[in-house]
Amino acid sequence: TRLNAFLVKTIFENLADDRIITDYSKIPELTKPVTIGAGYKPDWSTDYDAMIFAKVTGAEELIELSNIAHVYDKDPKVYKDAKPYDRLSWDEMLQICKGPWKPGLNTPLDPLAAKLGAKNRQKVVFLAGLENFKNYLDNKSFVGTVIE
């Protein structure tokens, strides 16, 4: 995840803080609009790391940028009739992300991260693709799922 963080940081150039945060107990003063974090503790998912990071920094929203733009009612790689969601409440998200967490679990967020996000009422946006991400940042129409 640290290599991915470095690659993502290069995309943001001057918008991102120079440091990649890897220890959420020692967060420096954040002076730029974008902060990149990477894996924190062994056996924690990157989803959970991101939720901790958002809480500690007071982030207004957390963006889950991946190769799948939406949260679906079931795995779209397995089920051709999977339906995407544009918006979900945290109660709805907790129904999708239930069960015990284990590495490689195929849910939009790991269940522990989903519980933490719900507890903190964290806004989370699922997006795919850099152009789509740019549209979201520019307040233009985008494809994705917003959880609040």
Task: Give the residues covered by each predicted segment.
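C-terminal catalytic "cap/lid" subdomain
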Residues: 1-148
